[in-house]
Amino acid sequence: LKPFVLPKGDRLLAENLSTVIVYGALTAFGVLTGSAGEAAPLPGAILFVLAAALGVVNVGMEYVEAALPILKRNGSLPRLRPASIYKGTFSPVKFLSIIAAAAAEELVFRQFMIGGILNALHAPLWLAVLLSSFFYALNHVYFGRFAVLQKMTSGLVFSLLYVCSGGSVAVSALCHICQNLFLYFYSLDRGKPAAQRKEAAS
């Protein structure tokens, strides 16, 4: 049997796989120790629709945060440029890894962290929301210092969705998944040769 080896240079798949493994272990620890709290029942469909829409809105908010300084400096708006790890042709494995990684992050930063802060530290809800968003933002510092500010905004949206849904991590996870999948599909053409993009547009 040949060992499973990730494609060379496939950062997206590698990072998502490591996220699922590490965050999955942390979540399991939180569940086993009871520090993460109990899973909330699923809310109404309207919250899921709102969460999916806010996933796309998050992309817009992060773009505005990055674009305004450039607009002020250059006098023109830049194009939306997702992280380079999203570039490439469509892969079902990458697609599933994006879903799994976003869900794993939400389990840790919302279910585990907010639940842990509330249950173990007995901190106020607003502090749990801020800390969860802050540490989620720091988790993306490898994208650059400015990305921390962008992810703080997204993190606040995820945390507020989690709280407003009564603690249902499924709602914040859907929002997170929709945001990442939007960026992934938006970037697919940018991973193709120029001739292919021109042919697809005709």
Regions found by a protein language model. Give the residues of each.
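Alpha-helical transmembrane segments of multipass membrane proteins
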Residues: 22, 26, 53-62, 158, ...
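Transmembrane helix-loop-helix hairpins at the membrane interface
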Residues: 86-202
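A ubiquitous, low-specificity "background" feature that marks scattered single residues
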Residues: 21-22, 29, 64, 68, ...
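Cytosolic-side membrane-entry/anchor segment at the start of a transmembrane helix
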Residues: 1-23
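Juxtamembrane helix-loop-helix connectors linking adjacent transmembrane helices
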Residues: 5-7, 31-101, 114-120, 193-202
